[in-house]
Amino acid sequence: MDMGDHIKAIETYFQAIKVRPSHPDAYKNMGFVFKLVRFTEPNSNLKEIISSILDQKTIIKPIDISRAAISLLKFDPDIKKLLEKSLACEINESFESIVSDLSRNPLLLKLMSICAIPDPQLEVAFRDIRYSLIKSVNKIKSYPDLLHFQSALALHCFTNEYVYYQNDKETSLIKLLENVIEDTLSKGEQPKPFLVLCLASFKALYPYKWSDLLEITPAINDVVTRQIIEPKQENQLKSDLATLQKITNQISSKVRDQYEDNPYPRWINTGLSLKPTSFSEINKNLKLRLIDKRIFENKTPNILIAGCGTGQQSIYVASIFKNAKILAVDL
């Protein structure tokens, strides 16, 4: 199937969605096609469709359609301007107006909030904006559009494990910012949301001893949920997970600690099957050549996922197989 066929398929599914907006199969199939497509011209309707797919949370992995979304977003005049200024090293001169423009791009902010964005140009631009923000903490006046963008940026950096390069100047500024927030909270006062979001774009908030003292306001609600509440819930859930045996091997312990500190891939939403099916139905769809047919007699399969990582595969498999018991194992 060439690119023209992909575009025709998308147009067909788009028409189906217009007739029946709640058509899950059309969204699912369109999501599969988006994985294969890079757009060469703007299309505002498709931006809305991608946004709708992301809103449904379980249609497809956000990262799988992020490249298609980015190829559409790059036709947006504000994003074109962002990339031009980033290339010319001019973001610092006008970053406030750039941020205001970007804050009004719902698809961009949605992508930033739920997945890594695999695009080197945008990565450099986001890194430059982040640096400009922390350099301006004592000068900038916060406003709703700025906080909206900052929240998306902090969520994005948390999801990508703070992979962006951090220079020595930023490290010093982060230390100052940490002290300001801690001192403010120690006085029984609340730090400005701008400062909290600025720090959250460089470091996760949950390890800080003062994290529980933050009042959850609309401006920082999403970031506090993702960076404080959910990690603490995860730690509580650890005690409920069954352990086969205690790990004594030093290397295995180090690998486990590494993945627990920086779970990869960190994910927010994932794609699931629309409905579970039996082995025989799956075999029919995949056209597998199985010699031993006895597997089709098993109506309640026990399935082992060895090396389940951060759980996406285990959850997906559980959504595929009808009446299955899943045992997911890892360090």
Q: What are the roles of these predicted feature ranges?
A:
Residues 1-303, 313-320:
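Alpha-helical solenoid repeat scaffolds of the TPR/TPR-like class and their adjacent stem/linker regions
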Residues 304-306, 324:
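Helical anchoring/docking segments at protein termini
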Residues 325-330:
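Conserved SAM-binding motif I beta-strand of class I
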Residues 307-311:
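Class I SAM-dependent methyltransferase "Motif I" SAM/SAH-binding loop
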